[in-house]
């Protein structure tokens, strides 16, 4: 999606703004999904560190992001399935590590790993989400993967005046 292109008389493309964007960059490291009100790290752990991680290392990675207060936040975590699946969009072809096509918005930089660890505790098999196929898979917790940390934005309260008596 993004911007549509219209043709004018001289066949020069003219960009037409479609209005507010769903994904908004909030500084150099953070993206806000305005549809779900979830903040995401722009880069996954593979892009950030250049190495794969098992599930336990993915949890440690999110803990380190909290210690460093990336984006000014200290509540980064592994995403839940219902959160991560909202990033999948077949209309986007974003080249991932090794040239694998990932179906995520181009606001996320190219080169991410195709699977990301998810929150979940099911014995020794842990959930991952595959951005090339749009599905959740369960694998051994010591398998290779990456993580794209997230956090939920707090609900904004509308300021109201106290009632007069």
Each language-model region and where it sits:
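An exposed tryptophan-centered "aromatic clamp" motif
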Residues: 54, 59-75, 81-133
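Short, flexible loop/turn elements at secondary-structure junctions
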Residues: 44, 82, 121, 151-153
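Disulfide-stabilized extracellular recognition modules
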Residues: 126-164
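Extracellular adhesion/carbohydrate-recognition regions
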Residues: 1-71, 75-76, 146, 150, ...
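Generic detector of ordered secondary-structure context
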Residues: 29-32, 109, 141
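Surface-exposed, flexible loop/turn segments at secondary-structure boundaries
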Residues: 48, 84, 155
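Residue-level marker of intrinsically disordered, low-complexity segments enriched
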Residues: 3-6, 12-14, 22, 99-105, ...
């Amino acid at each position: 999606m993004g911007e549509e292109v219209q043709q004018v008389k001289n066949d020069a493309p003219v960009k037409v703004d479609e209005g507010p964007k769903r994904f908004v960059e909030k500084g150099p490291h953070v993206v806000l999904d305005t549809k779900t009100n979830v903040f995401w790290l722009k880069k996954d752990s593979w892009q950030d560190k250049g190495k794969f991680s098992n599930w336990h290392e993915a949890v440690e990675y999110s803990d380190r992001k909290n210690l460093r207060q990336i984006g000014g936040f200290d509540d980064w975590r592994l995403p839940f399935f219902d959160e991560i699946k909202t990033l999948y969009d077949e209309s986007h072809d974003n080249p991932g590590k090794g040239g694998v096509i990932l179906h995520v918005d181009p606001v996320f930089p190219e080169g991410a790993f195709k699977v990301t660890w998810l929150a979940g505790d099911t014995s020794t098999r842990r959930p991952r989400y595959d951005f090339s196929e749009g599905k959740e898979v369960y694998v051994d917790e010591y398998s290779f993967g990456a993580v794209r940390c997230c956090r939920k934005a707090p609900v904004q309260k509308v300021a109201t005046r106290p009632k007069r008596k």
